[in-house]
């Protein structure tokens, strides 16, 4: 009998999730965290980034057989929940998952399970932030690699395996003169990384800090193709900066690449 290697691709985006373990929540009381996350001005900006950067890149995927779970806390105000759920119409791959405040592994494990189709033996789970993008062939390439890892036995019921594409563009939205930088990271990022696991595994791509993934699980890396756009805009929840080894890109070339490989409109996004 042929071995069951059925594999489903599911992404999780923690959308202003008021849980434990986030960068913003490290030293904040829960009430203060929620006040900061749900501030109307901040939420409007997060939706602009989500709608102009993250979602268009996923809508342009050459392989549309995937789900994106937007993980939110049950404390999110109704107006923002409603706006997020309204996006499920134009973006059929999007699903909203509401969970009480919890740690990053517990909450994301439950989110991945919400996206599971209940019959695939394996889940290839990727992570993405609401202000980042992946190349239009990201899902297709991730599936091709994941299927090969399963066939080779490098990933199985007991052994997860990570897939990392770590060349991409850093987009400094605050700079008009030097906005675009290209870099092949020395190791996996959280962005454009995924993990192949059994459908009831306790592990997922959020289990370890991205800098430690290769030290804990088998990891397949590709530093060649430009596969992600990471944005810097002054209100990032994490402490982002342009890495010192990144190379400055010519503006027209970068904008063409972002349009062709990511379905992004940089000028329109900046005006939003």
Predicted regions and their residues:
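C-terminal catalytic/acceptor-binding lobe
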Residues: 2-6, 12, 186-272
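Short, acidic, metal-binding catalytic loop of nucleotide-sugar glycosyltransferases
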Residues: 35, 53-65, 90-91
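A conserved acidic beta->alpha catalytic loop
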Residues: 35, 42, 72-80
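Conserved catalytic core of nucleotide-sugar-dependent glycosyltransferases
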Residues: 103-118, 133-218
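Short aromatic/hydrophobic "clamp" motif used to bind/position activated sugar donors
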Residues: 125-128
């Amino acid at each position: 009998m042929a071995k069951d290697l059925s594999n489903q691709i599911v992404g999780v985006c923690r959308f202003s999730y008021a849980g434990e373990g986030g960068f913003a929540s490290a030293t904040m009381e829960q009430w203060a965290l929620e006040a900061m996350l749900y501030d109307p001005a901040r939420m409007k900006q997060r939706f602009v980034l989500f709608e102009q950067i993250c979602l268009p890149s996923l809508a342009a995927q050459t392989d549309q057989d995937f789900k994106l779970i937007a993980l939110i806390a049950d404390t999110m105000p109704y107006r923002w929940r409603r706006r997020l759920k309204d996006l499920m119409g134009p973006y059929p791959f999007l699903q909203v998952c509401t969970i009480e405040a919890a740690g990053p592994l517990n909450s994301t494990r439950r989110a991945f399970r919400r996206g599971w189709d209940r019959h695939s033996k394996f889940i290839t789970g990727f992570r993405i932030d609401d202000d980042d993008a992946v190349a239009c062939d990201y899902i297709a390439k991730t599936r091709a690699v994941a299927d090969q890892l399963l066939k080779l036995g490098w990933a199985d019921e007991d052994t997860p395996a990570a897939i990392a594409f770590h060349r991409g563009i850093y987009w400094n939205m605050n700079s008009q003169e030097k906005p675009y930088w290209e870099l092949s990271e020395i190791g996996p990022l959280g962005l454009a990384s995924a993990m192949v696991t059994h459908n009831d595994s306790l592990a997922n791509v959020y289990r370890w800090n991205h800098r430690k993934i290769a030290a804990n699980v088998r990891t397949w890396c590709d530093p060649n193709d430009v596969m992600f756009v990471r944005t810097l805009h002054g209100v990032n929840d994490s402490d982002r900066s342009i890495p010192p080894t990144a190379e400055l890109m010519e503006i027209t070339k970068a904008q063409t690449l972002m349009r062709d490989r990511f379905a992004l409109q940089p000028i329109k996004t900046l005006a939003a």
